[in-house]
Amino acid sequence: MKKLFALILAALMVLGCVAVASAEQAQTLQLNWEEYAAEIEASEEAKAALSGDFVTMEEIALKIYIPAAFKQTELTDEDREAGYIAYFTMGEDKGVGIQYVDVGGMSLEEYAQRLTEEYGYECKDAVVNGLPALAYSFTENDRETSVLAFSTEKGYILEIAFAPTNDEGFAAVAAVLMASVQAAE
């Protein structure tokens, strides 16, 4: 498993550096699936390691690429009541959670302000495949979680959380998955 992450990390390191550099210049994180897909396609190791499919979330009209190494976890009634739409795991400690957050109709800007004021999170504006978003991270119990947040037409915030992103190998995988979020066709 560590070799798999090392291969993914090596294959995406150059692209990740370019994305970070351009994000710093523009002050807005720009993620584009076409760039990541081209980089993956150019590497046999990355293609093998990231083999998977797009999963469409009908209730949110978005899709996200999920590698075959991830398994969808069945949600409990409590999970659904907490707003979870889907949860994917890889191994025992790596995962992607997709959740609605009822924020009373807040905009992304208002939500960012709330996260900063109430929790001290540093939020960045983002555009993911043309969709306005908010990106932030937090650490709890030495485990970093990175989140993309999108505003919905119904006044909710849709959060897609990736953890642990302080694991370099998983951070590389999370970067690919973040860049894959796009409107469902």
What are these regions (language model features)?
Residues M57-A61, G91-V96, E140-R143, G155:
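Glycine-centered tight beta-turn/hairpin loop motif at sheet-sheet or coil-to-beta transitions
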Residues A6-I8, L15-E81, K154, F162-E185:
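N-terminal targeting sequences that direct proteins away from the cytosol to non-cytosolic compartments
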Residues L108-E110, S146, G169-V173:
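A short, polar/proline- and glycine-enriched secondary-structure boundary/capping micro-motif
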Residues A112-I157:
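Signature of long, low-cysteine stretches enriched in small and polar/charged residues
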Residues T56, G97-G104, C123, S137, ...:
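Second-shell loop/turn segments in exported
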Residues A49-V55, E81-A86, V128-S137:
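Short, hydrophobic/aromatic-rich segments at coil-to-beta transitions
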Residues M1-K2:
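N-terminal hydrophobic targeting signals that begin at the initiator methionine
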Residues Y87-E110:
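A short acidic-to-branched-hydrophobic micro-motif
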